[in-house]
Amino acid sequence: MEENISQKEKEKAEEEMIEQAFQELLNDYLATKHRKRVEIITKAFNFANQAHKGIKRRSGEPYIMHPIAVAKIVCNEIGLGSTSICSALLHDVVEDTDYTVEDIENIFGPKIAQIVDGLTKISGGIFGDRASAQAENFKKLLLTMSDDIRVILIKIADRLHNMRTLGSMLPNNCLLYTSDAAD
């Protein structure tokens, strides 16, 4: 039966799944004690959704489902507010697309941009090996964390969601990822 579903129907079903997940996030946020800044959260979601459009996770689900899940952890399990939720929604945009931290700052302001920058890995190539890159990423995370503890809390939410979804990875990738998560 799956073969009979047209590409447009699959895309429509994915869009509905994404919209439902985002609505759940908004409903969760609205149930919190935080001041209600739905507009900025919706703006961050729309921006991230467009930036990750057409990208899939290893599980086959739309990539945007990961930032939504991280934002839900940030909201529901850690109890952070709109700035952190926006940063969670945007946390992979700079790393995985052509957008820059400056773009994020121009659209969402300096605080969200600073947090997103703290969550963005330093790109490889300038460091000789993986261990050096990991050390530099850890150093960057610590320096940013000293300015804003939300960076480490969102990073923990990101790693937590990745660990919860290890079942969709190949066994070799699981080992590589779990060693990264331990770092």
Model-derived segments and spans:
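Active-site helical microenvironments for divalent-metal-assisted chemistry
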Residues: 1-179
